[in-house]
Amino acid sequence: MTAASQAERTVLEEEFNWLLKEEVHAVLKQLQDILKEASRRLSMPSPGLEGQLKQENFILGSSTMDQVKGVLTLQGEALTQADINIKVAKSSQVMHFAFRDDKQWKLQQIQDARNHVNQALQLLSSRDDSYHFKTGAEVNKLMDAIMLQLTRARNRLTTPASMTLPELAASGLMKMFTPPMPGDVMVNFYINLSKLCLTVYQLHVLQPNTTKNFKPAGSSVLHNPGAMFEHNNTKFEVSHVHKVECVVPWLNDTLVFFTISLQLCQQLKDKISVFSSFWNYRPF
């Protein structure tokens, strides 16, 4: 090895040690600050402190139809109030439903996303300023674990859960309303990216003599007209589907925080891989 290459190697090792000692912790601090903001936006009110988390009203609408209108009240992960008007397709009669006073509906997607963010924060807090990273592999392992939690958190907000129509019919959501939902109407709430969505299904009962072509629909986020299912020994077909939605600004903020955090993790991994490429062997 020449003196020049030895000197270069010494400089690289010093830079790499500085990366492990200083820059890694600077990135971890950045990640912690960003994810604390994300967690705060996704947080639920503490018992007895519900007033600290503000209630927000959102008007549901669609640019193409007016069969369904609604106002939802969201407090963290909980839908605390819902006021829905549904125009019946056949008669143009308007049905009105609201949440019972003793009921609120937890949005599992927000709850799950918050849990993943908090797991990422726990990983970060396990490596405080006093911790000394000894190898690049150790940093990469931590970044991979954090990125896994953040990807799962993001996926919960971007990918609503699929449900079968019988699952929806048996859901506790159907028991939330006053007056009670009639047997030929079903609703579903879910998050899609930064939007809070309401889907309303209007159904008709299939007569026994018309069920020879009965083909139950599978699991889906959004079922189409014509989808069939059986519930409580009665066969139904979806006759009309109405979807309305509204943008929730803090969900959009949260998704941006996830993107920035994932980029920070990847950039740190990239820096470590650049150092490793300077050596003929893997020094970390």
From Swiss-Prot:
Principal subcellular localisation of the protein: nucleus
Keywords: Cell projection, Cytoplasmic vesicle, Nucleus, Synapse
InterPro entries associated with the record: RAVE2/Rogdi (IPR028241)
Keyword Cell membrane: no
The keyword Lipoprotein belongs to this UniProt entry's keyword annotation: no
Pfam family, one: Rogdi_lz
Protein's cellular compartments: Nucleus envelope; Presynapse; Cell projection, Axon; Perikaryon
GO CC list: axon; dendrite; nuclear envelope; perikaryon; RAVE complex; synaptic vesicle
Family, similarity comment: Belongs to the rogdi family.
PANTHER family noted in UniProt: LEUCINE ZIPPER CONTAINING TRANSCRIPTION FACTOR LZF1 (PTHR13618), PROTEIN ROGDI HOMOLOG (PTHR13618:SF1)
Protein name, per record: Protein rogdi homolog
Annotated organism of origin: Danio rerio (Zebrafish)
Gene that specifies this protein: rogdi
